[in-house]
Amino acid sequence: MKIAVRLDDITPDMDWERFLKFKALLDKYQVKPLIGVVPDNRDDNLKGSRQGAPDDFWAYVRELQSQGWSVAMHGYRHIYSTDKGGIFPLNNFSEFAGVSYEEQLRMLTGGKRMLAEKGIETDIFMAPAHSYDNNTIKALIESGFNKITDGFGDAPYIWKGITFYPISFRLSDTLKKKSGYSTMVVHAGTIREKEWQGYESYFQRQDATWINYSEYMSLKPYKRGIGGRITEYLLAKAKSVLVNHLR
């Protein structure tokens, strides 16, 4: 299977020590990921060590983009304001799901404008907590987005005018598959010391091909029907229940 990488929670005040350590892994194995940049971070939980932080965060992001890294808008302020899981219910909290269309449109256009003012253009959305609803889809299209990094499956698909780039349901199973495409989701700021070796072992596996996210986005998507969407919803709900049960 060919696997791309996405890094969530990219902010000026994130844990730079961990981020740069993971970046070193990506550089070593020549993988250019998708990074989810929060336009106006207000979530204190995303803050961490400033060791190694660049003087100009936005210039740094632009430089990564010029080197072939892909950039998504990761929500607006990364503040969870509802207890809704939306149409991809991996979690029961959200910045977007359950919020009115008008407010979602305001957040999306505002966030996109903030990024543009910093010289960062993007048309791909990364929902905080993976949670979004039908109003999000409608507002994304209205505000100039046409891609979402989320969903389950083995290839990009189109639904309601948006192209979805699926993430891994369970990485251990994804790594064993012989064909298809998926995404490994990484929150570098929360990686524990004992987990670093595991991440390197993933990149060293002979049965997985690691690709740049730009290659993933170059694939022609297929059209997914209602049956596929229902299956995806049920899988996300089942995974949410299982994860909560194990906590």
Residue ranges and their predicted role:
Residues 19-23, 58-62, 105-112, 137, ...:
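Generic structural signal for well-ordered alpha-helices
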Residues 3-7, 33-35, 71-74, 122-125, ...:
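Hydrophobic faces of well-ordered beta-strands that scaffold small-molecule active sites
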Residues 33-37, 190-247:
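C-terminal domain-boundary segment and adjacent tail
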Residues 1-67, 114:
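Active-site beta->alpha N-cap acidic-glycine motif
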Residues 159-202, 213-218:
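A conserved mid-domain beta-alpha-beta active-site/ligand-binding segment of alpha/beta enzyme cores
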Residues 10-18, 40-56, 83, 101, ...:
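Acidic-and-aromatic substrate-binding clefts and catalytic sites of carbohydrate-active enzymes
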Residues 95-166, 196-197:
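Catalytic domains of cell-wall/extracellular-matrix polysaccharide-remodeling enzymes
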Residues 79-91:
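Short, flexible, mixed-charge acidic loops at enzyme active sites
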